[in-house]
Structure formats: structure tokens, C-alpha cells
């Protein structure tokens, strides 16, 4: 994966007991992320690639890298669909 997710800068968010709560100011909708999605959210800085995030997830939760890659891909797609984050192309160099 050579894509880098980045959080939507228009959203307000806070970490509560290790989980992320996101509030959309446009419609006041609240999104509560589970522990895994919260970790993806924290690493979605537009710099780390999906592969890098998957590696961190695999280490954090002691799961196979391929399983982590699949989880990250699904989470990123879901969060992008909800306009909570955007995906940019990673700069290879």
C-alpha cells in the first residue's frame, strides 16, 4: 500500500480511555472508534503509509502483518467513506 491516510482537519476529536471520539462540527455527528480504529486514527498523519500503520498495529496487537494490512485497509476505507479521513499518495524516495 503506497497510500497515506490523513485525518480530516475540520473535525474535533479527543482521546477518552484509549479510544477516539470524533465530532463533526458540520452535522454534530459523534463517532466513537474502537481500540484498533483509534490506533489507525492516531497514526493517520499523512506521512505514515498504510503499510507502516499496519506494521505498528501488528506489533501492538501481536497479530500477523497480513491480517493487520487487511484490517487497516478496511478501516481506512470505512473512515474515508465517512469523510473522517482522506487518503493521499505516499511520496516514495
Located regions from the model:
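Long, low-complexity, charged/polar intrinsically disordered regions in eukaryotic proteins
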Residues: 1-25
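Long, charge-rich, low-complexity alpha-helical segments
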Residues: 26-93
Amino acid at each position: 500500500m503506497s497510500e497515506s491516510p490523513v485525518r480530516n482537519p475540520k473535525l474535533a476529536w479527543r482521546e477518552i480511555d484509549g479510544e477516539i471520539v470524533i465530532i463533526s462540527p458540520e452535522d454534530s455527528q459523534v463517532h466513537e472508534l474502537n481500540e484498533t480504529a483509534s490506533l489507525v486514527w492516531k497514526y493517520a498523519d499523512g506521512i505514515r503509509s498504510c503499510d507502516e500503520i499496519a506494521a505498528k498495529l501488528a506489533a501492538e496487537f501481536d497479530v500477523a502483518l497480513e491480517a493487520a494490512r487487511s484490517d487497516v485497509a478496511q478501516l481506512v476505507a470505512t473512515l474515508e467513506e465517512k469523510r473522517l479521513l482522506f487518503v493521499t499518495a505516499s511520496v516514495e524516495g
